[in-house]
Amino acid sequence: MSAIAPGMILFAYLCGSISSAILVCRIAGLPDPRESGSGNPGATNVLRIGGKGAAVAVLIFDILKGMLPVWGAYALGITPFWLGLIAIAACLGHIWPVFFGFKGGKGVATAFGAIAPIGWDLTGVIAGTWLLTVLLSGYSSLGAIVSALIAPFYVWWFKPQFTFPVSMLSCLILLRHHDNIQRLWRRQETKIWTKLKKKREKESK
């Protein structure tokens, strides 16, 4: 166990460091997401600059790179504490990718994937919370923030032994959204629908 867990942490970080947003944009001939739109190499920004197909590809890959290392570690019988560190390592890789100059995304989809092995019921509740918040508010960032705040309570209800590692993940997500929190507080955050509408209007001209 002592040798496997650190190895899985390194593996998770390297998986997280594969920035699908940058790779998908390169393959599709789209602008670098770090230099276009919001500047965040994640699925939401790829949706703005490249459309639904590219965004879905990024979303699926980002979820999988969080899910697979944790699922593998879970299957090996690694304890919840180490599972939490493995999940955080995958998110740290996404946020600070060694392969892309340590400039990555905010880790929401990767964190979601890392939580998924705990149970599909929990995964569905968290996904539903994000979707409902976005539909009601129009803010993708607010959906991530609300989901991160509530996720530890959901986990405590479904699988209490994983409350601490999921709480650590939630803190990481909230820290990465500190700029969004300030913009939301000042009412300066742009709704995702507004950005998509502007993109369509620009393309139609």
From Swiss-Prot:
Q: In which pathway does it act?
A: Lipid metabolism; phospholipid metabolism
HAMAP family, alphabetized: PlsY (MF_01043)
Per its record, the protein catalyses:
sn-glycerol 3-phosphate + an acyl-CoA = a 1-acyl-sn-glycero-3-phosphate + CoA; a fatty acyl-[ACP] + sn-glycerol 3-phosphate = a 1-acyl-sn-glycero-3-phosphate + holo-[ACP]
Q: Report the superkingdom from the record.
A: Bacteria
Q: Which residues lie on this side of the membrane: Periplasmic?
A: 1-3, 74-80, 133-137
- Which UniProt keywords are listed? Cell inner membrane, Cell membrane, Lipid biosynthesis, Lipid metabolism, Membrane, Phospholipid biosynthesis, Phospholipid metabolism, Transferase, Transmembrane, Transmembrane helix
Q: What does this protein do?
A: Catalyzes the transfer of an acyl group from acyl-ACP to glycerol-3-phosphate (G3P) to form lysophosphatidic acid (LPA). This enzyme can also utilize acyl-CoA as fatty acyl donor, but not acyl-PO(4).
How the protein sits in the membrane? Answer: Multi-pass membrane protein
**Gene Ontology CC terms:** plasma membrane
* Protein name per Swiss-Prot or TrEMBL: Glycerol-3-phosphate acyltransferase
Tell where it localizes: Cell inner membrane
GO MF terms listed in the record are: acyl-phosphate glycerol-3-phosphate acyltransferase activity; glycerol-3-phosphate O-acyltransferase activity
Which top class of enzyme applies to this chain? transferase
Q: Which residues lie on this side of the membrane: Cytoplasmic?
A: 25-52, 102-111, 159-205
Q: Which InterPro entries match?
A: G3P_acylTferase_PlsY (IPR003811)
Gene Ontology BP terms: phospholipid biosynthetic process
- Identify the coding gene: plsY
